A protein has these predicted regions:
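Conserved small/polar residues in nucleotide/adenosyl-binding loops
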Residues: 1-5, 154-157
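C-terminal non-catalytic interaction/assembly regions of soluble proteins
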Residues: 106-156
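Accessory alpha-helical/coil subdomains and C-terminal extensions
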Residues: 4-125
Length: 157
């Protein structure tokens, strides 16, 4: 697990606590553009009930069915979504923020699209949070440090 994964996982642990105390569904949007490894790794580590990644489009019905199952078992559902995730039927990732410095769409906001739909279709109060730039900071994990040391050692020899 790398810095981004552990920071995202810690944030999701806090979201789970909030969801549990209020019996809400929490949607956590993480960065990653068109690659879902941050969402996948942190979602698995945090015990998310639904993980939405760009590589695997899902329908709103599939998402809400999993949310409802978790809620029916007495859980406060946690949904982790990568910013580049597309719902089945969407042509491209959600973007309403213009273009970035490389003239690509600025991704983000899919969590705010999903949350009210989950709420509407399940009747479960749902909140969305974008983890954003907080994922970019933090101290390297032990794994990160060992990996960097090994890479340095191999490149030196």
């Amino acid at each position: 697990m790398c810095i981004r994964d552990s920071i995202a996982t810690e944030a999701m642990d806090r979201l789970r606590t909030t969801g549990d105390s209020h019996q809400r569904c929490m949607v956590a949007e993480v960065m990653g553009r068109h690659v879902g490894w941050i969402a996948l790794h942190s979602g698995i580590a945090a015990g998310a009930h639904v993980i939405c990644i760009p590589e695997v489009p899902m329908s709103l019905e599939e998402i809400t069915a999993q949310v409802q199952r978790a809620h029916d078992r007495g859980r406060a559902p946690l949904v982790v979504v990568s910013e580049g995730f597309t719902l089945k039927g969407m042509d491209e990732a959600y973007s309403d923020k213009g273009l970035d410095a490389f003239n690509r769409p600025r991704l983000g906001g899919i969590g705010e699209v999903l949350a009210p739909e989950i709420d509407r279709l399940t009747g479960i109060e749902t909140r969305s949070t974008v983890l954003g730039h907080i994922q970019r900071g933090g101290s390297p994990s032990a794994f990160d440090r060992v990996l960097a040391t090994r890479l340095g050692a191999v490149s030196y020899t």
